[in-house]
C-alpha cells in the first residue's frame, strides 16, 4: 500500500516512523509536506476566557512560543497534544481522543 503524508516535515517523519513500526514493509511511505508552520508574536488577552482548548501540537507550540503562562483550565484533543502541552509547562485538565468527546 502507498501512503502520502502531507503534514509539516518533522511531524511527517514522526508519523511515518510510527506507521513503519506498526505496518512494516507493507507500506510505501512518501513524505511531501504541503505546509510549514510559522509562529507569530501576537497579544492575547486571556482574562475573559475560562479555559483553553488545544487540538494539535502546533497549537500548543504556538501558544508556548508566546511565552504565556496561564492558570486557565487546559483541554486537549489527543494524547500527544496533551503530552506536548505538559512538556510546555501547561497543566492539562482534561484530554479526549477527539473533539466530539471533549
Report each predicted region and the residues it spans.
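Signature of uroporphyrinogen-III synthase
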Residues: 1-102
Amino acid at each position: 500500500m502507498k501512503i502520502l503524508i502531507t503534514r509539516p516535515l518533522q511531524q511527517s517523519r514522526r508519523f511515518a516512523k510510527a506507521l513503519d513500526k506498526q505496518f512494516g514493509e507493507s507500506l510505501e511511505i512518501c513524505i511531501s509536506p504541503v505546509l510549514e508552520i510559522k509562529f507569530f508574536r501576537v497579544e492575547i488577552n486571556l482574562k475573559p476566557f475560562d479555559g483553553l482548548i488545544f487540538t494539535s501540537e502546533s497549537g500548543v507550540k504556538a501558544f508556548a512560543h508566546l511565552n504565556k503562562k496561564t492558570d486557565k483550565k487546559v483541554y486537549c484533543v489527543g494524547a500527544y497534544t496533551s503530552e506536548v502541552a505538559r512538556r510546555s509547562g501547561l497543566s492539562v485538565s482534561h484530554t479526549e481522543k477527539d473533539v466530539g468527546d471533549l
